[in-house]
Curated annotation (Swiss-Prot):
Transcriptional repressor. Specifically binds DNA and probably acts by recruiting chromatin remodeling multiprotein complexes. The lineage of its organism: Eukaryota, Metazoa, Chordata, Craniata, Vertebrata. Residues 243-252 have a biased composition (Pro residues). Gene3D superfamilies: Classic Zinc Finger, Potassium Channel Kv1.1, Chain A. Expressed in skeletal muscle (at protein level). Residues 24-92 form the BTB domain. GO terms for cellular component: cytoplasm; nucleoplasm; nucleus; plasma membrane. InterPro entries: BTB/POZ_dom, SKP1/BTB/POZ_sf, Znf_C2H2_sf, Znf_C2H2_type. GO terms for molecular function: DNA binding; DNA-binding transcription factor activity, RNA polymerase II-specific; zinc ion binding. A zinc finger (C2H2-type) spans 294-316, 334-356, 362-384, 390-413. This is Zinc finger and BTB domain-containing protein 42. Residues 121-141, 166-188, 207-256 are annotated as: Disordered. Belongs to the krueppel C2H2-type zinc-finger protein family. ZBTB18 subfamily. It is found in: Cytoplasm; Nucleus; Nucleus, Nucleoplasm.
């Protein structure tokens, strides 16, 4: 005997408990914002929270602090509402912010939907689109359809779905439609690029300038970006703006310097290591002789490892984004003077204004490429290092992005993953 309304009732009761703070056994911190929630719901909806609570000791699970440079409080609030309601509201909030938060939390169904939105937006803004009524060279990409992950009886009852997934409509006869590419950015990479990337193995990027030599202005970079990062297409529309500031000339680094950083670990042990080492920068005594050194792409300081460089970059991004604010004292929602869009806080409005002005304040010292958002620069740095820090625990194959590792595990080790999630 089935009770199709049971799933909807369960979500409704959990939502009421969260609003009242009843039986909430954890608190998620995003900047200064606090979100009480239930661990079971977070772990069921997010791979990030599942791994966090699985690896953390029992006494340190009450508080979870997310990276405020990637996840904004309004975006996480929308994702938290989705976990408890089965609905995702993208109104009055930049899709890029929701995509960044969903990628960080490994909520891949939301990642697919947000990328589809951005792809459709880019196609609508492309001046090369065919006129209405003209036959396109290729059929348009199908738009993901929301489907409930419940039994058929629950769909008849029109209840809010507990889990959602993006499903493509059945393929019609004729030439095959183009597919939405599965990019390798789903943990940190936050936007789009057409076409899949082929995995290539490169040695670490070691530059050939002597350590004691002075930098020469106008020198050509020795390492070029051979392919755009998946995150860089979110700035494609703004790159056409005539007000885009010129890129500074690239500055070569010293011999033996490896430019790069390592993505933040998802496990509890790595998070504890990051918290213990926060704020500690490498001095000249710590660098020591021998071994590859890492250079900061923003200030050119040297560090003994990519982990210490990651800590240093986080301090940079906190300084640049420290002007984050909430609603104005009079309670009026911040509004863009150019397009009239309203935002939940002035910080998101400031980020949105970059799409109009073309401002790209974050610049890679190695190749001179500029980015609108700090996390895009962090992910772009991996292009120079060719690092592959994400290793499959079952076959030891390594990947540059955690999204590649996720799809590899889902394709080749699906049975093992299901056994872990039980």
């Amino acid at each position: 005997m089935e009770f199709p309304e049971h799933g909807g009732r369960l979500l409704g009761r959990l939502r009421q408990q969260r609003e009242l703070g009843f039986l909430c056994d954890c608190t998620v911190l995003v900047g200064d914002a606090r979100f009480p929630a239930h661990r079971a719901v977070l772990a069921a909806c997010s791979v990030y929270f599942h791994l966090f609570y699985r690896d953390r000791p029992a006494g340190s699970r009450d508080t979870v602090r997310l990276n405020g440079d990637i996840v904004t409080a309004p975006a996480f609030g929308r994702l938290l509402d989705f976990m408890y309601e089965g609905r995702l509201d993208l109104r009055s909030l930049p899709v890029e912010d929701v995509l960044a938060a969903a990628s960080y939390l490994h909520m891949y169904d939301i990642v697919k939907v947000c990328k589809g939105r951005l792809q459709e937006k880019d196609r609508s803004l492309d001046p090369g689109n065919p006129a209405p009524g003209a036959e396109p060279a290729q059929p348009p990409c199908p738009w993901p359809v929301w489907t409930a992950d419940l039994c058929p009886a629950a769909r008849k009852a029109k209840l809010p779905p507990f889990g959602v997934k993006a499903a493509l409509p059945p393929r019609a006869s004729g030439p095959p439609p183009c597919q939405v590419p599965e990019e390798s950015d789903q943990a940190l990479d936050l936007s789009l690029k057409s076409g899949p990337r082929q995995e290539r193995v490169h040695p670490p990027c070691v530059l050939q300038t002597p350590l004691c030599s002075q930098r020469q202005p106008g020198a050509q970079p020795l390492v070029k970006d051979e392919r755009d990062s998946l995150s860089e297409q979110e700035e494609s529309s703004s790159s056409r703006s005539p007000h885009s500031p010129p890129k500074p000339p690239p500055v070569p680094a010293a011999k033996g310097l490896v430019v790069g950083l390592q993505p933040l670990p998802l496990s509890g042990e790595g998070s504890r290591e990051l918290e213990l080492g926060a704020g500690r920068l490498a001095s000249e005594d710590e660098l020591g002789p021998g071994g590859p050194l890492c250079i900061c792409p923003l200030c050119s300081k040297l560090f003994p490892s990519s982990h210490v460089l990651q800590l240093h970059l986080s301090a940079h991004f906190r300084e640049r984004d420290s002007t984050r604010a909430r609603l104005s004292p009079d309670g009026v929602a911040p509004t863009c003077p150019l397009c009239g869009k309203t935002f939940s806080c002035t910080y998101t409005l400031k980020r949105h204004e970059r799409t109009h002005s073309g401002e790209k304040p974050y610049t890679c010292v190695q190749c001179g490429k500029s980015f609108q958002y700090s996390h895009n620069l962090s992910r772009h740095t991996v292009v120079h290092t060719r690092e592959k820090p994400h290793a499959c625990r079952w076959c030891e194959r390594r990947f540059t992005q955690s999204g590649d590792l996720y799809r590899h595990v889902r394709k080749f080790h699906c049975g093992l993953v299901k056994s872990l999630l039980v």
